[in-house]
């Protein structure tokens, strides 16, 4: 049994109502419920946190190490383009992670094209809406079982 942690960055608490043309109509609660169900069906444990505060995400990453978290799925949202601190926290705990974005950041404003995470992530999924989280979970479980 693996333990996975899903981290959602700033403004993702507004999913379903925030710019649905860019981010879709699925709520964060629906995404989390789907991931929890899929993990549970596979015999795994899934934790999640959404925060608009960078320090809360960093502290959660630090705690993940001592909790035995095996893999992290992270949508850093706006912190993607600004947070060296989150990047450093992920590197410090040495837990593999996949970066997820609902929208295709490469089709958006130029400042969104740069990520502080992509070069150290196992992989990046962007532009596939809420399905990206499901695909990231599947990929993480394949990585953990050696089927990747």
Curated annotation (Swiss-Prot):
Pathway annotation: Metabolic intermediate biosynthesis; chorismate biosynthesis; chorismate from D-erythrose 4-phosphate and phosphoenolpyruvate: step 3/7
Site entry: Transition state stabilizer: 18
Catalysed reactions listed for this entry: 3-dehydroquinate = 3-dehydroshikimate + H2O
E.C. number(s) listed in UniProt: 4.2.1.10
Top-rank taxon, per record: Bacteria
Function: Catalyzes a trans-dehydration via an enolate intermediate.
The entry's keywords: Amino-acid biosynthesis, Aromatic amino acid biosynthesis, Lyase
Record-annotated active site: 23, 101
GO process annotations (BP): amino acid biosynthetic process; aromatic amino acid family biosynthetic process; chorismate biosynthetic process; quinate catabolic process
Protein name: 3-dehydroquinate dehydratase
Residues annotated for substrate binding in this entry: 75, 81, 88, 102-103, 112
Family: Belongs to the type-II 3-dehydroquinase family.
InterPro entries according to UniProt: DHquinase_II (IPR001874), DHquinase_II_CS (IPR018509), DHquinase_II_sf (IPR036441)
Pfam families in the record: DHquinase_II
Enzyme class: lyase
One Gene Ontology term of the molecular function aspect: 3-dehydroquinate dehydratase activity
Subunit structure: Homododecamer.
Keyword Lyase: yes
Record carries keyword Amino-acid biosynthesis: yes
């Amino acid at each position: 049994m693996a333990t996975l942690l899903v981290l959602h960055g700033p403004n993702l608490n507004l999913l379903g109502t925030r710019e649905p043309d860019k981010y879709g109509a699925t709520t964060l609660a629906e995404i989390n419920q789907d991931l929890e169900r899929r993990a549970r069906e596979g015999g795994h444990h899934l934790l999640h946190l959404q925060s608009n505060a960078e320090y809360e995400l960093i502290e959660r990453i630090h705690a993940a190490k001592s909790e035995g978290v095996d893999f992290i799925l992270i949508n850093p949202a706006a912190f993607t383009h600004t947070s060296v601190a989150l990047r450093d926290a992920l590197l410090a705990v040495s837990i593999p992670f996949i970066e997820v974005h609902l929208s295709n950041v490469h089709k958006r404003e130029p400042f969104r094209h740069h990520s502080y995470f992509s070069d150290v992530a196992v992989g990046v999924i962007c532009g596939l809406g809420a399905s990206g989280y499901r695909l990231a979970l599947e990929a993480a479980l394949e990585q953990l079982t050696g089927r990747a």
